[in-house]
Amino acid sequence: LDATQLHGIATNLDYLRQIVATEAFHSGTVWTRFLDSFTPAAPVIEVLQPGTFSSIQDYPGRLGYWDIGVPPSGPMDDFAFRLANRIVGNDESAAGLEFTLQGPTLRFHTDATVALTGADCAATLDGEPISNWQPLTVKAGQTLALGRAQQGCRGYLAVRNGFDVPEYLGSRSTFSLGQFGGHAGRTLRVADMLPISRPALAACTTPPPVSAPQALDAALIPHYGTEWRIGVLYGPHGAPDFFTQAAIDEFFASDWQVHYNSNRLGVRLVGPKPSWTRANGGEAGLHPSNVHDCEYAIGAINFTGDFPVILTHDGPSLGGFVCPVTIAKAELWKVGQVKPGDRIRFHPISADDALAREKAQQQVIATLRPHHAPTFAVPSLAETASGSATILAAIDATATTPQAVYRQAGDKYVLIEYGDNVLDLALRLRVHLLMMALSERAVPGVEELSPGVRSLQVRYDSRIISQSDLMSLLLGLEATLGDVSTLKVPSRVVWMPMAFEDSATLGAVARYQETVRACAPWLPNNVDFIQRINGLTQREQVRDTLFNA
């Protein structure tokens, strides 16, 4: 029984484990009335009230599947989450609970040591107020109630040993949109029973605690206000390629308000409309924000038309809109605490500055003591002789090779673009060649490769390989790729079912029209728009073209 794993709907597995562990069972003195006096102590936490969008998450989340569109998920405020695990002494990979604006009410069926971090939700234990940021002993039968967030947006609960939920694609994090991970692949509901891991069991996959519980130094407790300063790196798309320099300057000079239509997929911002250097996106679309493809970095600020959205932990991996800046990894936790109505001022930082901040944050988590990063000069946003300040390097086209542009996409990503902004299979083959060459090298610090049509995103760990060393590697590999005009690669034909104008698609268009943009050339019906711009006489021709391709 100790080696048995059963997940999902609650079972009597632990009940049986406790029965076979009794002296009566071992001595063979069990009789028909034995269970009348047997009181089990289930290692679970019962959900009396689920709170708002409460879910199981772990750090760093579900990495390695960005190329097939699976997001990392994980805690929106990973700083508070990791500190919660550190306070109770857990291994960093232990699963914890995230809740948004309104916390849950939980009944403990076993003794436990817990820690609350993040937004202060006026927590009480059996009606008595308790404090965040320190270990707390909870006895079996007690009720922990979390109210509405006083400051900030998201709170976190860590329990010593972590929550016992199965790993899916290498993570216990909930991706509710995909309906997998966490507890039953969804947010919490009334009467859910959340099992606590027991590392002593052979079936347990959660590592045991690594230290004794320890309170956080008061100087380290973050301040959650309504005005935020967030450090970003310029790029991948800037001036003068896409935006005017005036638009970039205005972006950094403005206070951006957090829109109510924000969640774990993205945080919508309200602010000034940008000015563009292009009239449209060419082949990619009617709006100048359109590009054929862009692999998105977590923390990228994505302009869907004239409207910016911070792409977060459950967001899309690939799209067709430009991103002028990307939030530094050590600053991204702040996005998890902004709430509707808050204001954000972004400020540019360098890759070296971002790395120093990340190292300082890591030291704080490791030691639970203050650690300050050195200061760095503010990087220039002005256009250079080689073009936009977002461009790390560029290689001119030749008779047999396309232009290659290497764009900074935060402190953890480089975006490589080939050729012009057109749909060309030869460019996709070159992306494939580069991806294979990088994979074969297996360079330490190069962690993930995500291809698009004419682009490749490289995710790297700047603590292992610097941006400059990565660029040297990429430029060196580019010189070895050569001409792809005669390249042959293994291929196959995949037949996929597809619904035309499905109700879910029509519903998405309706929501877009209601919440994002009321009037646009492609509204109110996308098929009518495609028919019109392609000069077709009947809308059925759109369907026929699609299915006959």
Question: What spans do the regions from the language model cover?
Answer:
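Catalytic cores of soluble metabolic enzymes centered on carboxylation/carboxyl-transfer
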Residues: L1-P43
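Conserved "landmark" site that anchors the functional core of diverse proteins
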Residues: A41-A549
